[in-house]
Every structure is written in C-alpha cells, then in structure tokens.
Amino acid sequence: MRKQAIVCVLLLGAALAFAASVRAQQIEITEMAGLAQIFGEAQNNDVPLSMNDMDMVSGGYLLYETEVEANGEEAVLAVENIRDYAAVYVGEKRYGELSDTHKELTLALPEGTHKLQLYVENIGRITYGPEILDNTRGLWGVITYADNELDGWTMTPIEVKECVVGELIYEAFKPTEMPGFFKGTFSLDASREVHLNMSGWGMGEVWVNNEFVGTYWENNLQQSIQVPAGNLKEGENTVVVFELKNNGNSSLSLSDKIVFK
C-alpha cells in the first residue's frame, strides 16, 4: 500500500510539473511565409465570380482584387452578397471585415488609386433554413465603393487545404498586417496532449509538426486548439499558423486545458 501511495505521489508530481511547464511556455513566431506560394490559377472578370463559378466545390479561401479611386474622404465599401467572411486589405493594411451579416465597411483612404484585396473564407455549407438550396459561396453581385460599382476583378484561389506547410519557403519574421503563414517552436519534456491558446489571433488554421490540428476564429467561444499526444514528440515541436485576419500577433502560448473567452 505504501509503495502504491509513493507511485501515485510521483505520478501526480510529474503531471503537475508537466502542466506547469506547459502553462509557462510562450511560443514566439520566428519565421513567416507569403501566400503567393500557394496561389492557384487566377481568373479575370468584370464582375466578381463566386467560389462556385471558380469550380471551388469544397469552398476554402479566395482572394478578390481590384482597384479603387479615393478622394481622401471617408467612403463606404458595400457588397451585395458574401458567404461567409472577408478580411479587407488596402495597400497591405487591414481595414476591417465583411460578413453575411455585416456587408458594409467605411474606409478612410488617401487620395489616389489603391489596390483593394478581399480575402474571403467559406466557413461551411448551409444545412437548414430557407437558404438550404442556395449554397453559393464567396462574393457575387454588385460591389461598390463610394456608390460606384467596382469592376475589373481578379479572383485567385488560395490553396491552403492542399499545401504542405513543411515545404513552404520561410523567411525571418517581421511585423506585418498581411495574411500569411507564421512559424514557431516549443519544447516538451514528454509527449502529452496540450492545447494551443489562440487568444488574440484572428481567423485561420494550425499545423503542429506538419500535421493539421484545427481551425480558430476570434468570434468563437473556445479560443484553443487541442493537440493530441500523437501529434507531439519529446523535445522540439513546430507550430505553423495560417492567419487570414491578421491581428498583428507575434506569439501564442501552450495551455494544459481548454481556453474560453
């Protein structure tokens, strides 16, 4: 009985030590990779093409680009149809988001011609309600800026689902507002389940040791991603984050439990 008690104490001590080491670990982003490496074949069209029009049957990510003329005053960017979400960038600066419930965004742009980039994600298929038979995804219909219809669109698939993150070409990390892949490392004394705390990050996907482990979104109640022990190893582990809505984070952390808002 005494021997069993000692074993239990030792096991409990090891578990507590592991949990403490996990809680203490901050994962610094040290490398980054641009999205151009995983661009699919682009298509040009006068009006925006939906993901369905682009033969993206399983949804995913699609970049919409055109030019806007600004007079230096605030003006509204408005989309007729969007499913489900778009991060709005102008000149490599993030200005905000659009969604199927928030279809307008006020932009304060300097006077001149600017490249408008809308990084669109389809979150999932409609499985209930009056729109169940309409699973159009992406952007379609009229898009205006300052009440002027925008034309001359380029649509480029972003092949996140097909890419192998370990084969991307990375460079040293530097602060950016653009979407991309962001890499860091962390160490474990033993291979056990952990949780990646994604609090503060925007929206995207995560890989650990080149294996996909999950997605995150700042609007979700749960802010962590479970990483099974089978995806981990003793010693150094690599994490890669694909961030669509870049909040400017340069680190994430480990947790020994699920993290909620």
Regions found by a protein language model. Give the residues of each.
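Aromatic-lined ligand-binding clefts that engage carbohydrates, nucleic acids, or primary amines
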Residues: 74-89, 116, 186-209, 216-217, ...
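Sec/Tat signal peptide C-region and signal peptidase I cleavage site
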Residues: 18-24
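Bacterial N-terminal signal peptides
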Residues: 8-17
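Glycine/proline-rich low-complexity spacer/linker segments in large multi-domain proteins
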Residues: 121-151, 246-261
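C-terminal functional regions that serve as terminal interaction/effector modules
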Residues: 122-123, 202-219, 231-261
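Bacterial N-terminal signal peptides that target proteins for export
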Residues: 1-9
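Carbohydrate-binding surfaces of carbohydrate-active enzymes
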Residues: 24-133, 163-168, 244-246
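Exposed aromatic-hydrophobic patches
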Residues: 103-109, 223-230
